[in-house]
Amino acid sequence: MEPTSVIGTKNKKGQVFTDPRIMMREAPRTPSFYTGSEVIKEAIRRASIDVMIAYPITPQSEAAALIGELFAEGYIGDYFRGESEFAVMSQCAGAAFGGARVFTTTAGPGTMRAMENFPMWAGARLPIQCIVTCRGINSPLSIQPDTIEISYLMQTGMLVWHAETAQDFYDWILMGYMVSEEPEVHLPLALCCDGFFVTHTKDVVDLTPTDMCLPPYDPYRSPVPCMDMECPPVRMMRDPFIMKSNYISYATHASWQQEVWAAAERSRKHTIAWLNGLIETEDVDADVLIVTSGTAVSQGREAIRLLADEGIRVGLVKIKTLRPWPEEEIKEATKHATHIIVPEFNVIGWMAKEIKATIPRSERVIAGPRVCGGMTMPPEIIVAEIKR
């Protein structure tokens, strides 16, 4: 059934299946004061989710519990708890193989434990959405924000977006399904935020009407057939390619891995349309630019305000999506800059490395300041880096 055929009809909760463009662009919005976790719940209330699978790990546990309330209220089709993060992501794959719209959440060590499944999701072309509320993963453990796990996710074949605010989070959850479920894309989405900074602080978020929801997922638009889970048509693990011919194995895997990354590239035009671009810029003619993603953008904004009070002009480039990577946009935005400051919430500086690999005259990139393990980033240290 085409999604357009249900537009205007109602689900069992009385919500109207609404054209996503009307719902997100034209429908009236209500300002609401919510934590990021509550915002996740409100987005899922309107997302026509078939299956949510949960396993608790801070800072996403609250969101997973709140979505359980939505199941009790009848807003999502099914909800159950996994035995571990690895089990959750495997079960998500099973539900998506069966043609369900699937949602889950994880963070930090949970992301690491689940990691094997993410390339499998991408390779199987499963448009699952996973919220990643980034936190420390090193020993000694920390439950505080750290974005190192994003660097791993960027190599899985998934789409990877990085939200700055709760408003980003709300809009991008709903828009994310519209991009990832496009037949020429059909890839999983890791929608990341900086844990606690976004999940546990309150902010004003403009919400779409509660009586509107996304049209349901249509698995028949998938570029690969959904699987009959009662009578699967193939034996998934017996007689693998390599048992028959190394050449067949190489050809199969090489071509399909290239197709997965090509699908991520094909998401670019859809993502640009929904997110109003892969980057957001302010005053890019300035000699000094702050270029980063997530809540480091928010700290950069405050640093820019402090510097403006001293008569120092600094521009900003907010990177919204990491996969697809906005290569041409970053080159264009930074072409006039003499110094490019890249503040990050991780120890390895993966964002600075990506930017250095993207732009000409990479010596302009100043990798830092960086904080890690859950430390805050006072805007004053960005100011000090720029003055230095």
Task: Locate each region found by the language model.
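Peripheral docking tails and interdomain loops at the edges
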Residues: 13-14, 343-388
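Structural signature of the thiamine diphosphate
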Residues: 160-224, 339, 345, 381-388
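N-terminal glycine-rich anion-binding loops that anchor highly charged ligand groups
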Residues: 32-69
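Generic long, charged, amphipathic alpha-helical segments
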Residues: 300-333
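Conformationally flexible catalytic loops at phosphate/diphosphate-handling active centers
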Residues: 8, 188-280
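Thiamine diphosphate
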Residues: 58-149, 154, 158-182
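Glycine-/acidic-rich phosphate or pyrophosphate-binding loops and their flanking alpha/beta elements
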Residues: 35-40, 265-288, 301, 305
